[in-house]
C-alpha cells in the first residue's frame, strides 16, 4: 500500500516521466512518438509535458475536454508500461490508435476503423487476464468513438 501511495505523491513515473496533474483522465495512445504532434495539432493549447525514450506526452483540450496523447512504442510490453504508469497518475480512459492491415477490399488506406474485438495472441495480456477473457471494448466506448 505504501509503495502505491509513494507513486502518487507528486513523484514522476519512472518511464513516462509524468506525475499526477500532468495528464488528462482521457488519453490517446499511438505507438509512434512521431504521431503525438500530428494528433496534438487538433488540440487547443497543446503543451508537450514529457519525452523520455519512446514515451512522448502532449496535453491540451479538444472540443472543451482535457485530453492527453502519449506514445507507447512498439509492442505490448512497452504499451503495458505506459498504461500502468498512466493509470498510476490518473488516466481513466485509454484509447489505443494505430495502423493495421485490412481484410476487406472496401477498406481503404486512411479509413477510420473502430475495432469491436481483438485476438489476444501475444504474451503480455495473460499477465493481466486469463486468455479466455475477451478483448472487447465497452459498448459505451464504441458509441462515443463513433460520435467523435
Residues covered by each model-derived region:
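Metabolite-binding pocket within alpha/beta catalytic cores that recognizes anionic/polar moieties
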Residues: 2-144
Amino acid at each position: 500500500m505504501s509503495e502505491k501511495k509513494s507513486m502518487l505523491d507528486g513523484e514522476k513515473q519512472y518511464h513516462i516521466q509524468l506525475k499526477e496533474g500532468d495528464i488528462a483522465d482521457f488519453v490517446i495512445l499511438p505507438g509512434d512518438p512521431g504521431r503525438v504532434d500530428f494528433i496534438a495539432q487538433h488540440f487547443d493549447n497543446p503543451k508537450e509535458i514529457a519525452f523520455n525514450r519512446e514515451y512522448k506526452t502532449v496535453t491540451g483540450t479538444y472540443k472543451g475536454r482535457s485530453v492527453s496523447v502519449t506514445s507507447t512504442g512498439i509492442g505490448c510490453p512497452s504499451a503495458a508500461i505506459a498504461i500502468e504508469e498512466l493509470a498510476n497518475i490518473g488516466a481513466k480512459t485509454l484509447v489505443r490508435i494505430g495502423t493495421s492491415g485490412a481484410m476487406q477490399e472496401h477498406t481503404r488506406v486512411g479509413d477510420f476503423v473502430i475495432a469491436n474485438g481483438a485476438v489476444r495472441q501475444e504474451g503480455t495480456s495473460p499477465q493481466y487476464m486469463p486468455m479466455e477473457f475477451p478483448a472487447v471494448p465497452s459498448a459505451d466506448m464504441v458509441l462515443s468513438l463513433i460520435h467523435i
